[in-house]
Amino acid sequence: MYATYIFPRLMDWVLRGERFQTERRHLLAPAQGVVLEIGFGTGLNLPHYPRTVTALHSVDPAPLLPDRVARRVAQAAFPVHIRHVSAERLPYDDAAFDCAVSTFTLCTIPDPASALRDIRRVLKPNGRFLFLEHGRSDDPVIARWQDRLNPLQNLVACGCNLNRRIDQLVLDAG
């Protein structure tokens, strides 16, 4: 019940804040063509995609708050296709997308390295990967606290990891 109803509403409320909306607008400004979004959630990115986006395909392992998703999808300026599958095995052809997007998702994917490799596979040769994530701090004091708090965070935030080195994972995936 918590993971299905309470946590998604809490995250939708937190991530709707103006600071996050500003970050989304900046992140998504270069998106164009056919876009793959990893971790659709409740669709908070939808209003921030530019007019250069012609279609959005998204993967998310579980449906979240279908009423909010339906409302946001209905307001989109382009077709939106959502599949409830894992990001580690994307059900798309090689080089199918002009752009891929991930916002606050790589922290929860069980095998982010596999997901990033598969994202690279489905991107066209000159495709762009746009991401907005949190991860392990470079400050050793903060990093130690992230390590200490990670088990609790993982439990209360439905699999979110505070201490992943997202930047390194992205670089390693190419």
PLM segments and residue spans:
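Conserved alpha-helix/loop element of class I SAM-dependent methyltransferases that forms part
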Residues: V14-V34, L44-H48
